[in-house]
Amino acid sequence: MGLENLKPAKGSVKKIKRVGRGQGSGMGKTATRGGKGQTARTGYKAKRGFEGGQQPLQRRLPKIGFRTKDSHIYSINVEKNGAIKDLEEITFSSLRALHHFPLYIEGVKLIGKDAKNLASKIKDERIKTSGQK
């Protein structure tokens, strides 16, 4: 067996598709593009997300989610949460440990009758009490 007898394995080499080279090839005339229409023309490219007239996926699914650009202030009622009164220092991280509020919260407002009494314990500028601006 010499180099001249070597052949690739059966089915490993595909036949090259030469389109528009006569009707005898089976891919002549319309060159496998079908007759007329937008897809038969040169330069045709479907839009991203186009599904052939079917309602596209991004339009079938509902619109979800919105986050306002306004500042996010989280209100905590002091009367309902006695744990805040027991804190020696009120900081943003200590309140986060007590109340599992979302990460995007930028400030906390303490509300209720006893909130003004806690103003001296507050050690963080992101925390305000009711009546305070």
From Swiss-Prot:
GO molecular function, one term: rRNA binding
UniProt entry keywords in alphabetical sequence: Ribonucleoprotein, Ribosomal protein, RNA-binding, rRNA-binding
Highest taxon of the lineage: Bacteria
GO cellular component, one term: cytosolic large ribosomal subunit
Renumbered residue ranges of the record's region Disordered: 1-64
Alphabetical GO biological process terms: translation
HAMAP family given in the database record: Ribosomal_uL15
PANTHER family attached to this UniProt entry: 50S RIBOSOMAL PROTEIN L15, LARGE RIBOSOMAL SUBUNIT PROTEIN UL15M
UniProt record similarity statement: Belongs to the universal ribosomal protein uL15 family.
Subunit note: Part of the 50S ribosomal subunit.
Function: Binds to the 23S rRNA.
The name this protein goes by in its record: Large ribosomal subunit protein uL15
Organism: Helicobacter pylori (strain Shi470)
